[in-house]
Amino acid sequence: LSLSEEDALKAQIFGCWSIPLGLPYNENLLVRIKLKLKPDGSVIKSEILDHARMNKPGQGFYKVLAESALRAIQLCQPLRVPTTGYDRWKDLQLNFDAREMLEG
């Protein structure tokens, strides 16, 4: 995806994302998600790339944050994807930074 296409996709998902309250701002609030998409923008698979972090001590907030990002992807289906170039965007990695969204 081009940068503008990726930004548009993230903006769509951000619109569906209810970020949990009470996040520790001094922590890394980045969630990396790998997506596999159908040509119509439906999600075949979504996977948290930092899955091991979800079960580390003191990272309970990350599990809640990551699960909320996955829910946003499910709620926003089908994603608005380009009508051409399926091979370029059928497998994507998107970075969701809660701090970026909260700070505007």
Sequence positions of predicted segments:
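A generic structural signal for short coil/turn motifs at secondary-structure boundaries
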Residues: G22, P57-G58
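Soluble non-cytosolic domains of exported or imported proteins
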Residues: L3-D7, G60-E67
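Intrinsic-disorder/low-complexity signature in envelope-associated proteins
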Residues: L1-S18, G22-L23
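Conserved "boundary/linchpin" sites in short secondary-structure elements
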Residues: A11-S18, K34-N55, L70-G104
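Short loop/turn motifs at secondary-structure junctions and domain boundaries
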Residues: P24-N28
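Short amphipathic alpha-helical segments at helix-loop
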Residues: L1, M54-P57
